[in-house]
Structure formats: structure tokens, C-alpha cells
């Protein structure tokens, strides 16, 4: 007899009434009384455990059930009984149990409650806990939503390289490969972005996207930063800043809406765990007609006024042109000024933005955009790309960027490169927002951060 999925049982319980079935999974919980043992089994198909009942009128089976340790792998066979008056619509009346693998008594995840910090230190086991099971299921469904959106809108997927000879962002926060010079005959890094590869392919396919891991050697110890994280990076030829803003908003709203539909069970569970207003927040994002769009200079005025009036008390209070907005500023704009709504900030000073961003006519700003979210701050950043070769070279020189490894990127401008625009959306940050997580390390299976790489 092949195993039945627990998710199928809960989806259509009436179809399984009085049927003999087999389950394979793990023992998640066990309750014993004088005459009956309740085994809670999970097979990974759903967040819910199925209750399997062992009665005392089968002494050998009862004794076996009593001896099974938590986390043991089991095969359980029996007859389905409907229980419409109970919390669950059905249960399994057990006739046979096979213990496939016995978990030792020192299994770390016992019945008691564990802190999130405990789980972060035991990342290889934490997905067995319901909280992380739910988070990682949402992660999978969010990934699916990303692919569904871009394929439905005729984007071509580009597999950008992990190893690279350049620092895309020009910030110097890269991991250098120890054997790079010896093996490749030049300095080699782990990629900080798939953008450059996407730009190349956008000049052929027009609309492309990358979705993969990126690496930053930032020695940050905040709840918002990882050294290895996943990025969604679309790139569109002939697009401008207005086109980009529309694409970002459409992407974010659509994928969140799809996850809300497909991961309702998991999100309801996480709402009870972390955030009583989780679904309300997500609905507010998806139902907002248009995200607010704010000029960088206007953002400075709002922040300066808020500080002067006593509405806010920022740690960083220098609101002169050239301020790189901090998280406290970004969150104030979203949460206080715009009443918990997303905000696009556009046209930033060129001095702290990347060399490849297209300069505006004013000579001091670039066509860049950041999407700010409540509770998080920046979740997405993008720009128009500089299409003029001479201007791009001048910008590299002004920023003292060695163009030896960028010749191919510059050369693209020689042959039909009219315009391009793209953005990078932090997948893990978006997931953390959707799940109501305060620490991004809870949003990725095996978090890597400064001083922490245990697996």
C-alpha cells in the first residue's frame, strides 16, 4: 500500500471515511492516558499533524506506541474515522506501526518552547519546528510566485555567474576567491549582483530577470543584513524610471497576493506566532492603489520638519543634500508620514550611488529609486543605467574605479545600447516582511553573517 499524503486527508476528509490507509512521516507529539495513546504524525505535506489513535485493546501495539520517541520516523497504517465535532475533521485508528528509524532520547527539539535564538544556533534542525516549517514553506511559495510573475509577463530567465572578476556595486565589500589569480589568472570574487549579466542579455531579449544568491562582505551584526542572500534582479531594455516604478509595484503586489492565497494556512499560523496584524498589513500593501512616489529632496524636507516640530527625534539629523537615508528615516516616511504605506524615493544624489546609474539633467542626481516598506525600510533598489559611453567612463574616473575588468561592460555601449533599467529586490527581506519576522536570519535556511557560518 502506498502512503497517503496528510494534506489530501485534510483537503477532502469525507472521501477517506472508513478507508484503510498508510502514513509515513515523523512523530511530532505523543499523549498518553490510561486507555489510549494519541500519536501526532507529520509527513511534510502540510503544517498540520494528523492524530493517530492507538487503543489499549491491542496490548502489543499499545506498548510499541508507548515506546516510540519524538522525531522517530514511522509508518502507520489503519482506518480513517471522521471526527466532525473535534478540532480535526478526521483521525486514524491505528492497526499497525512500523518504526523505521528511532530518534535518540537526546533529540534537541523536545516539547518545551524554544527561543528563536536557540533555533538560529540549530539551523540544521529548526525546519522540523512548526514555525520554521511554515516560514520555509512560504519561502518556497514566494519563489514560485516570482517565477510565475516574470514568465507570465514574458521575461527570460538568465543564470548569472557566481564567480566574477568585477565588483558590480563598486563598494569594495566583496569576498575574494583565494585561488582566483592562480586558477583564472585574475582576481576573482563572489558576485554581489547579477545585474551586469542581466544587462547583457536585456540587449537581446529586452526583458530578463535573474534570481540567485549574492554575497557581501559587510561586517554587519544587524537583524537586516546577511553575507549571503538571494536577489531578484529584472532588467528591461528601452525602459525609464517611470517604467521601472510600475514594474516594481506590480511585481511586489502580485507576488504577495499569490502567496496570501497559496500559503494561507502558514500565514495564519505565523500571524498567531509573531504579528497579530500580519494579514492586515499584507492586504494594505496589495490593496493600495498606487505606492507613494517622493523626490529625495522632498524626503529631506519632510524629515527636517518632523525633527524641528518634535514629531521625531532622529539619531542622524543632518538633512542637507547628500544624506544617505538611514533606516530610521526610511521607516518614519513609511510608518508615520504616509501611515504605514510603501513609498518610492527617487532621484538620489549621484555621490553615494553606483557608477552605472544614469545622471539626470541637473548634474547632481541620478535616475535611481528605492522602495521603502513599513517595519523594514529599503526593500528594493533600482535605476536607469547610463547608456552614454563617455559619461560612463567619466563617472568611473571620478570614482577612481579601475575599468580594466569592466571593458566588456563599457563596450556594450558601443553597439546599440540605447537605454536599460532594472532593480534588485531582496528576496529574504521580502520574505521576512511577509512572514512578520524581525530578524532576517529567520528567513533563510542556513544564514551566513559576519562571524557565523556553522553549516
Swiss-Prot record:
Reaction(s) catalysed (UniProt annotation): tRNA(Asn) + L-asparagine + ATP = L-asparaginyl-tRNA(Asn) + AMP + diphosphate + H(+)
UniProt-listed GO biological process terms: asparaginyl-tRNA aminoacylation
This protein's UniProt keywords: Aminoacyl-tRNA synthetase, ATP-binding, Cytoplasm, Ligase, Nucleotide-binding, Protein biosynthesis
GO cellular component terms listed in the entry, alphabetical order: cytoplasm
Keyword set includes Metal-binding: no
TM segment ranges: none
Subunit structure: Homodimer.
Protein's recorded name: Asparagine--tRNA ligase
Species name: Mycoplasma pneumoniae (strain ATCC 29342 / M129 / Subtype 1)
Gene it is expressed from: asnS
